[in-house]
């Protein structure tokens, strides 16, 4: 047997091994691919984006809270004034009493604030991925601005303005003396802009089988 014969057989063997690997992948695709293929999302994956928005909302809430804490400190206000106002929906006016210094309650207020942000994150991320996926950063920021302003108006003046007095006998959250309207709006805008900036973190990239690779 000549060297050329051996080289030819080795080349043929390499071809057969490659063919065997391809056939194994096809068998795997036939055995498991039907289920995977039916599950794989080819359109809009609402469950994924809602879950991703839940996580991204936590990040955005932390950023907006830090923005408010730093801003309040620079302005010579109580760093946790936002949380105190937030806690009036439950504790009433005593949450704003300077003598109120319950560390656990304030910590729980921060937790509830972040939890609210996680829920809002679902709304923001679903809308952004559904309607602003091809808009670029500037487009997403514009969408986030509109959503944030709409959420602020709806929550503060469409819901809280009448619900808090009804339940707790006061309207501290919409009282400009306690929380100026522009501070509340700016907090919502920072949340929305953060959602627009970290939007790529929550994009879905479907898994592709080896046989589907180009």
Task: Give the location of each predicted region.
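Juxtamembrane/disordered regions of integral membrane proteins
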Residues: 2-214
């Amino acid at each position: 047997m000549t060297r050329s014969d051996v080289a030819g057989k080795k080349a043929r063997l390499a071809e057969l091994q490659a063919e065997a690997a391809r056939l194994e992948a096809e068998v795997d695709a036939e055995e498991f691919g039907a289920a995977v293929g039916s599950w794989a999302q080819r359109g809009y994956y609402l469950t994924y984006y809602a879950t991703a928005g839940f996580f991204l909302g936590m990040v955005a809430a932390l950023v907006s809270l830090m923005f408010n804490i730093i801003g309040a400190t620079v302005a010579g206000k109580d760093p946790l004034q936002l949380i105190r106002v937030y806690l009036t929906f439950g504790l009433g006016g005593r949450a704003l009493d300077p003598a109120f210094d319950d560390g656990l309650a304030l910590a729980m207020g921060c937790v509830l604030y972040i939890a609210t942000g996680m829920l809002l994150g679902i709304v923001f991320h679903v809308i952004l991925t559904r309607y602003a996926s091809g808009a670029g950063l500037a487009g997403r920021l514009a969408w986030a601005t509109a959503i944030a302003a709409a959420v602020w108006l709806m929550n503060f003046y469409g819901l809280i303005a009448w619900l808090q007095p009804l339940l707790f006998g006061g309207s501290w959250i919409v009282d400009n003396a306690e929380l100026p309207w522009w501070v509340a709006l700016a907090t919502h805008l920072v949340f929305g802009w953060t959602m627009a900036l970290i939007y790529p973190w929550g994009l879905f990239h479907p898994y592709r089988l080896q046989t589907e690779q180009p």
